[in-house]
Amino acid sequence: PAVRAELEAQSVIGYPANAIESLELSPADQAEYLARAGKNLSSWYRLMMAQNSVLAEFRQAGIPVAVLKGAAAAANYPQPNSRSMGDIDLIVPPDHFEQAFSLLERLGWENDIELEINPRHAGFKKAGCPEIELHRYFSTCTNKQQAHFLDQAIYNAIPRAEWTDVAGFSVPVLPPL
């Protein structure tokens, strides 16, 4: 139904799982929705555990890092684990990019050129884990001056990232710019 499509479009398929009965769905639609919500929850924990492991290594190596989108957005949800996430988006200051790239490779993550759909990030894959996008920059502004300004603001904020609890996982979230 339209409700399910909208929940998926907004990356919150699991959000109303505890209130599904009140949506007056058919038993078949209810069962399908609950199955999708359960799958989302399982994927969420798998991603967060992989991210947690990588972030611990970045911390130990002294590499300033922040999570973009995904868990950083989920930190603002009443039920963070209801947010759908497909990959892990990380950003480091430009002078730490090569160090971060090498660290991911040492941890067994393979640089995957096919994941590099644009020059914004390097893509990494590892068996049984979600993909990682290590961002070189974030802005997609076509105005170069605006893009540079936004990216500089993000780079300057990374060392001040606030390690925030997201459903039991510690996530470096950019402070207000």
Question: Where do the PLM segments sit?
Answer:
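Conserved NTP-donor binding/palm subdomain of two-metal-ion nucleotidyltransferases/polymerases, i.e.
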Residues: 1-86, 92-177
